[in-house]
Amino acid sequence: MRFQNPISVPSLLELITQKIEVKGEVDFPITGINELHSVEKGDLSFVDHEKYYDRVLGSEATFILINKEYPVPEGKVLLICEDPLMAYLEVVNHYIKFTPQNQQIHPNAKIGKGTIIQPNVFIGEDVTVGENCIIHSNVAIYANTTIGDRVVIHSNSTIGADACYFQKRPGGWVKFDSCGTTVIEDDVEIGANCCIDKGVSGVTQIGEGTKFDNLVQIGHDTHIGKRCFIGAQVGIAGCTFIDDDCVIWAKAGINKDLYIAKNTTVLAFSGID
């Protein structure tokens, strides 16, 4: 997630209730907040498990919340605290707050010329729907979703719901609040009862000309390429990249963090891990 206005480290510390020890210095502000899979230079990220220390410290992230004393890599700032995840979530929740909506279509939503919105459709804040689309009854389009031209979404599908992303702790599951977005490109058709989760901090993207059957689940931060065909009851986990012109037949399951090459065909009931 990009910040509308970059912030300084002292301003960041005002958003976090924990004690933070700052190590390192750079000459530019914090420009966004992102999880490991989508970090860029200038981003704030976090790490709280030794399995990921090297990956996060070696990533593009410039500002890192961490729960361990560690040599400061060149060009980075370490923000040492007891609980990096909760510090990270405090920052997310400062920028992303749930606001109840009492209209079916948010006043600032943008609906293109020739688009048909059927009864009982919900469209959230900062949503853009392109021209000549058909959005069928009972579709829910969550905030911060962008839909291209000539897109068809069939009844009861949900676009841009929160990621299913939690950390197990002694007191129960802690949710990673989602601050990412969803992009549906031109000429996509989405069947009935499909669910496409928004990015945790990045983008979930469905490429131009791709077609979904019914009951498809797409996890957070996943990229589906152009002209793909996804059969009924396919489930694709988060942070996976499906390249262009792939065909995935019914009830296939694809795990997280994978790359599926162009023109791949996945047969029905397959499991890819």
Report the location of each language-model feature:
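Terminal amphipathic alpha-helical/low-complexity segments used for targeting or macromolecular assembly
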Residues: 1-108, 114, 150, 156-157, ...
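Structural signal for interior beta-strand "rungs" in well-ordered beta-sheet cores
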Residues: 46, 104-273
